[in-house]
Amino acid sequence: ISADGVCVSPWKPFIGASRAVVIDNKGQKHNVEALMGANGIYDIVKFQIQSSTTPAALATNVTANSNAWIVTTSKSYPPAKAMVTKVEKFMEKYNYSVLTTDVDDKLNGAIVANDKGQVIGLYSSNNSIKSATDAAFARDFVISGLSQNDLTLRECAIRVALPASVEEATIALMLSADKSESYRDGAIKEFLGKFPTLNDGYLANANLLITKN
């Protein structure tokens, strides 16, 4: 959903994972570097990979009785047609699209696009309910300095990304001190990359090196 490697996908495959790899439509593998927010109710997560990506265009408007296409990166599954039968709003501005399609839960997490190729959301088949959750919902996730304590994100061992502001990022860096060595190392490297002139990152790195020795 961005040119700098920010992605969205279903959350359930991340639960209990200590690492994750995504495969793009060219077959290239990318390690998930950090989580940027998740919602268990709508089964969606936002995360960062280290790669330049071509962002997908997100649909801003979805209407009932319109065509949709369920698309994957796998050559084994050609685009499958669907129909948007109903559109419900949640949190006032995001679309939850109810679909009619023959596609089963094997393609859960696939892109659902309109006739213009714009992304309506991520596909979900749960018993008799087939739907698409607005990808813009995950796009708008914002992490804070305390996001490491979020109950949903704690279901996954992958590191939580640092917030954009220096104040919140400093809090997150401090909280990472009691995490695993790899978690701390990732947080420190991200902090130094974002704020190379601040001493906090170098002090945290020095403390990490001491504990290694």
Residue ranges and their predicted role:
Residues 53-108, 123-134, 149:
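Flexible, gly/ser-rich surface segments that form the specificity/activation loops bordering the active-site cleft
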Residues 2, 15, 61-65, 113-114:
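Short, well-ordered loop/turn sites that connect or cap secondary structure elements
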Residues 185-188, 201-213:
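Alpha-helical protein-protein interaction scaffolds
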Residues 121-190:
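C-terminal cap/linker of serine protease catalytic domains
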Residues 2-42, 136-137:
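Catalytic-histidine neighborhood of serine endopeptidases
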Residues 36, 120-121:
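A structural microfeature
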Residues 193-203:
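Short solvent-exposed coil/turn linkers within tandem alpha-helical repeat scaffolds
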Residues 1, 5, 9, 45-47, ...:
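Terminal peptide-recognition signature
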